[in-house]
Design a protein with these regions (language model features):
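Hydrophobic membrane-insertion alpha-helices, especially the h-region
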Residues: 9-24, 570-583
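C-terminal region of N-terminal signal peptides and the immediate post-cleavage residues
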Residues: 20-38, 581-598
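Peri-membrane helix termini and adjoining interfacial loops of integral membrane proteins
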Residues: 23-26, 307-311, 383-388
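Soluble extramembrane regions of membrane proteins in the secretory/endomembrane system
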Residues: 30-323, 703-706, 722-749, 798-800
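Extracytosolic and intramembrane catalytic regions of membrane-associated proteins
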Residues: 70-110, 117, 142-143, 216, ...
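C-terminal domain-closing interface element
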Residues: 188-207, 330-352
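Juxtamembrane/start-of-transmembrane alpha-helix segments at the extracytoplasmic/lumenal side
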Residues: 317-335, 397-405
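Alpha-helical transmembrane segments of integral membrane proteins
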Residues: 338-653, 661
Length: 800
């Protein structure tokens, strides 16, 4: 290796160490022991609750959920906290085009403050999905609230009231939160909500959502949370995605607050594998320690002044939270653009570049951005071909994603290095460096306009990298220090973002992580340029100050005289990519501990007597254990099932893989008239109906076809909206329905043929069903492993 390369090794070593240290700071803390101080949070103590709460499936309305509710009340009572149960019907429209309702039972407890100006509301949901025990989701949040409440009672009450809300029915429809918010909407002004969630088995706890005008909230979070991991970019993205938690309903009702969750190891999410044993107790420690500290922080301030006039930009750096006002987003983005422009002008004045070459490099910089993204997606497609079961993973992540994520990072770095090596002779290294920084500056401006909380991802790396280049151009002797320092902010900002983005979006969207790696790489290209630069008579730093002999020369020294094997860099990265990828694939297989998901549902059309097995999972019959098991029930072709069984997921067009199933002899749901009013002048009349499942299924559905003249609807006394999605004028799902059914009040004109259905959990008692093998498990879907019975009934306002 040339002496020139050796001179820059300390800078590269510092960058690599900084990268490793930045990512390592995201590691979860060690769980505090059971004998930790009584006023502190202990994951070991909290985990005892997790083992009880997550020992069985406990969906809304189940006997197991009632058992867990009594346990929560008993634990609160043992700590001297009185709890009440809020029972009622919650209604939500957040999870789809229709309306979802449920009979819910929230546990609500209050710790009175000494001098309250408002209340801190701690929220976690107590129910699980219908196929998994919810060890993390949301056993972690529930246990953290119980341990936080215990610590608060031992450490002195805060000034403000603390309200503990253990919601019911979150997984089904957010209906517990809906019921609580509906009853306490008037408390939004002087409250701060802290919602605790989990979407996986571990990883750092990320504060991923806030209410608007979050500056005061973020200030408290950064100052008091012992493990403050959160980014304003995540908040901006989450606001634009159709994802919802209980916090959604609080935020929409005007409550201020923060939403936190751990999201890694997401292959267990909403599956039978979400057990207490699968939980990272360090994640539980971080969840609870943050919740306790923030409760005390918000409990000691005047909650009448916890909203500001804008949002902060913030991101984690080495265990701290860096933040600045949103008002600085545009000035910093503009300053970054000016710094890059100044670097281009100074480099041109030094005759190191020409504008055409910088422009050419700017255009060609699209290549590493696009190619790395495409290759990352092709890599996921290849993994899906090798391991077909990953097509059925809800979050798009395998069980052991670490090596595969590393492969994506190395692949993006390889593409960027190859781009540089191939073009530096034609374009020039300095021109390519400036082109990359120009892309960062441009993206900083674009994000400032479209996603203000994410502008820092590009603007700050561009600003500091351009600053380092300007210093080196002006004072060449400072280059060995200026370039690494200029590149360091890109590492500090983008390395943790990449590490957090992979579990957030999954390898199925690996292109996003690859893109951020390339952006970080653009900030490192100036350092790479000096590293691979040719020898000169003087020190290496002098080369950036040496004018070219002609005005159109892009490099003062020919590359041929530099490091003779620059192609080794992309070659090493390519080999590393392949090694990480092969090892990642080898360790990402399925077994009894890490089973392959398989989606299956039974559906009976009571009108025709025809029953089917249905699966939303694509695939071929001989590709993997899940597909071999599914082949006993469904074929590879698809059938339109959405019109007959609208509750089934399937594809957007309502098609699913199907197979003939034995028809079970069970009674179909009924819709009976209780009363009918007289039609008004426009022909509308109000009908009172009862929808019931004679077989005792806990979920009921009512659907009216598009074109039905429906003026208003109330279900169990709650108004619900009508939809206009092209298929159904009304779509209602009711969870945890009473055994005597639910009351529906329709104001309708004319006649309509309603589609009604009921849903029950489990397939094991059905004729023709074969149990899954040990290495296959139910899929993470709300309609997995359920039996649906549907029929069509006439509804009319006309007298018979």
């Amino acid at each position: 290796m040339e002496a020139n390369v050796l001179r820059w090794l300390p800078g590269w070593a510092a960058i690599l160490l900084l990268t490793a240290g930045t990512v390592a700071q995201l590691a979860t803390p060690a769980p505090a022991p059971a004998d930790a101080p009584a006023d502190q949070f202990s994951a070991t103590r909290a985990y005892r609750h997790v083992r009880v709460l997550g020992s069985h499936v406990h969906q809304v309305g189940s006997v197991a959920q009632d058992t867990n509710r009594r346990y929560i009340i008993d634990q609160l009572a043992a700590d001297g906290i009185d709890a009440t149960v809020q029972r009622g019907v919650g209604a939500s429209t957040s999870l789809g085009a229709g309306s979802q309702l449920a009979e819910v039972s929230n546990v609500v407890a209050r710790i009175p403050g000494r001098h309250p100006t408002g209340q801190v509301i701690l929220v976690a949901h107590t129910d699980s999905v219908r196929v998994g025990p919810g060890g993390s989701d949301d056993g972690a949040g529930t246990a953290a609230l119980l341990e936080t409440a215990r610590a608060l009672m031992r450490g002195g009450r805060p000034d403000n009231d603390v309200v503990l809300v253990f919601t019911d029915g979150e997984e089904a429809c957010l209906c517990g939160a809906a019921a609580y918010v509906a009853a306490h909407r008037d408390q939004a002004r002087d409250s701060v909500v802290l919602n605790l969630e989990a979407r996986g088995g571990g990883g750092p706890v990320v504060m991923f959502e806030t209410s608007r005008n979050n500056a005061a909230l973020v200030r408290q979070f950064g100052a008091h949370a012992p493990y403050p991991v959160g980014t304003s970019f995540a908040v901006e993205i989450y606001r634009r995605l159709p994802n919802d938690t209980d916090f959604t309903l609080f935020r929409e009702a005007g409550f201020a607050g923060l939403n936190s969750a751990y999201i890694d190891d997401s292959a267990v999410y909403h599956t039978p594998q979400d057990t207490p044993a699968a939980m990272d107790r360090g994640s539980l420690q971080q969840h609870g320690a943050n919740a306790l500290a923030l409760t005390r922080a918000f409990g000691s301030v005047d909650l009448r002044h916890q909203t500001a006039s804008g949002d902060d930009t913030y991101f984690p750096v080495l265990g701290l939270l860096v933040r600045y006002p949103g008002a600085l987003v545009w000035p910093l983005a503009a300053l970054a653009a000016l710094a890059v422009a100044a670097a281009v002008a100074l480099a041109r004045r030094r005759r190191l570049v020409t504008l055409p070459r910088v422009a050419g490099g700017f255009g060609l910089a699209v290549l590493p951005i696009a190619v790395s993204a495409v290759l990352a997606q092709l890599g996921w497609a290849l993994l899906g071909w090798i391991r077909p079961g990953y097509a059925g993973m809800l979050t798009g992540d395998p069980y052991h994603p670490g090596l595969l994520r590393l492969a994506v990072v190395l692949l993006a770095a390889c593409v960027l290095a190859l781009w540089y090596v191939l073009l530096r002779r034609r374009i020039g290294g300095v021109a390519l460096a400036l082109a990359g920084l120009s892309w960062l500056a441009l993206l900083g401006l674009v994000l400032a306009a479209l996603v203000p909380g994410g502008s820092y991802l590009a603007a700050l790396p561009a600003l500091f990298a351009a600053g380092g280049l300007l210093v080196a151009l002006r004072w060449p002797v400072a280059a060995p220090v200026a370039f690494p320092l200029g590149a360091a902010p890109a590492v500090l900002i983008l390395a943790p973002t990449v590490a957090l983005l992979f579990p957030a979006l999954g390898l199925a969207t690996g292109a996003a992580g690859a893109l951020l790696v390339v952006l970080a790489g653009f900030a490192l290209v100036p350092l790479l340029t000096l590293t691979l630069r040719g020898r000169t008579a003087g020190p290496v730093a002098d080369t950036i100050a040496s004018p070219a002999p002609t005005a159109d020369r892009a490099e003062p020294v020919t590359v041929r005289r530099g490091w003779r094997r620059p192609v080794l860099l992309p070659a090493v990265l390519l080999v590393s990519t392949l090694v990480a990828g092969v090892l990642g694939v080898a360790t990402s297989g399925f077994d009894a501990r890490h089973p392959e998901p398989a989606h299956l549902t039974y559906a009976l059309d009571a009108d025709t007597g025809r029953a089917i097995w249905a699966s939303s999972q694509p695939g071929e019959a001989d590709r993997g254990a899940a597909q071999r098991w599914l082949s006993h029930f469904v074929g590879t072709g698809t059938e339109q099932v959405g019109d007959r069984f609208p509750v089934l997921g399937g594809r957007a067009d309502g098609r699913m893989r199907t197979g003939k199933a034995p028809a079970v002899d069970v009674p179909a749901p009924t819709l009976t008239a209780l009363s009918a009013g007289r039609p008004d002048a426009d022909g509308y009349a109000t009908l009172r109906l009862r929808l019931r499942s004679p077989r005792g299924a806990p979920i009921l559905g009512l659907y009216l076809p598009h074109g039905a003249a429906v003026r208003s609807v109330r279900v169990q006394g709650k108004p619900v909206r009508t939809t206009a999605d092209g298929r159904w004028a009304l779509a209602v799902t009711f969870y945890a329905a009473p055994t005597n059914g639910i009351t529906v009040q329709l104001t309708l004109k004319g006649s309509v043929r309603a589609r009604i259905l009921d849903e029950s959990d489990g397939l094991s008692g059905l004729p023709g069903y074969r149990p899954r093998p040990a290495d296959v498990s139910p899929a993470a879907a709300h309609d997995a492993d359920e039996a649906v019975v549907a029929r069509t009934v006439p509804v009319s306002t006309r007298p018979r």
